[in-house]
Amino acid sequence: MSAAEAGGVFHRARGRTLAAFPAEKESEWKGPFYFILGADPQFGLIKAWSTGDCDNGGDEWEQEIRLTEQAVQAINKLNPKPKFFVLCGDLIHAMPGKPWRTEQTEDLKRVLRAVDRAIPLVLVSGNHDIGNTPTAETVEEFCRTWGDDYFSFWVGGVLFLVLNSQFYENPSKCPSLKQAQDQWLDEQLSIARQRHCQHAIVFQHIPLFLESIDEDDDYYFNLSKSTRKKLADKFIHAGVKVVFSGHYHRNAGGTYQNLDMVVSSAIGCQLGRDPHGLRVVVVTAEKIVHRYYSLDELSEKGIEDDLMDLIKKK
């Protein structure tokens, strides 16, 4: 990491936490705030999808560069500034070992360096970042490039947990890494219960479910029934209010008991009818309110008055 990166937005997660938010300063509720959530910039997918070769295609990503630049510009214009900008995985399209991976990574870093230095980045690993069947080597590459693959941090009395959801999809080549995350997660959820934090929020790439906890296994876009139910019950027991994810390239989601599952569409390639966009998430003492904006809407109009009123409420 260069000195410029160290002093800029790349406050990479290390030691399972995010130095941008010191726990000793952020453990108490201080009033409403908001953050921006994006997913799947996935440099290269638009071309790969258009040619029908998602495994090997993706040799162009100019569209994704322009879209991500538009997202960054829209975020930088916001006032007040968001507490952070989280990207929920699939940062690039080229899987580990595939052509163009290095070039896509460098181009995304270049675009993200333009994020206002006062807005830390929170980076979540996706299946394209570490592979559909991750290995110790692919996870290590992600950690070296972008920071820890799972970690927690506090902002104003709210506990945020970032998970590596690929460990729940296929940990067959790195079972010990999956076990380590499981143990860590249990410890973090225990802290959430004991501390009675204002809210607890989870970020992961693959959704628990797309609409319902009881939906069929999709074998790609959701976690298996047994895995999702086990995780969701753990989250609910610890008081987690909402899980945010990407991966689906469409907006979706549902509720299981008192746990909201929010699936946010992509900055990059759309697989449904949603526009390229970002989600504004407002955290108040009582609730978590979120709204998806197209990049054009957020660029031209900013955040709507009703959300701004919540942010400014004392």
Swiss-Prot record:
It is an enzyme of class 3 (hydrolase). Disulfide bonds: none annotated. Its EC number is 3.1.3.16. A divalent metal cation 1 binds at residues 53, 90. It comes from the Eukaryota. Expressed in subcutaneous adipose tissue. It catalyses: O-phospho-L-seryl-[protein] + H2O = L-seryl-[protein] + phosphate; O-phospho-L-threonyl-[protein] + H2O = L-threonyl-[protein] + phosphate. A divalent metal cation 2 binds at residues 90, 127, 247. Induction: Transactivated by the large envelope protein of the hepatitis B virus (HBV). Keywords: Cytoplasm, Hydrolase, Metal-binding, Phosphoprotein. The modification Phosphoserine is found at residues 2, 294. One of its GO terms (molecular function) is protein serine/threonine phosphatase activity. InterPro entries: Calcineurin-like_PHP_ApaH, Metallo-depent_PP-like, MPP_CSTP1, STPP_CPPED1. Belongs to the metallophosphoesterase superfamily. CPPED1 family. Protein phosphatase that dephosphorylates AKT family kinase specifically at 'Ser-473', blocking cell cycle progression and promoting cell apoptosis. May play an inhibitory role in glucose uptake by adipocytes. This is Serine/threonine-protein phosphatase CPPED1. It comes from Homo sapiens (Human).
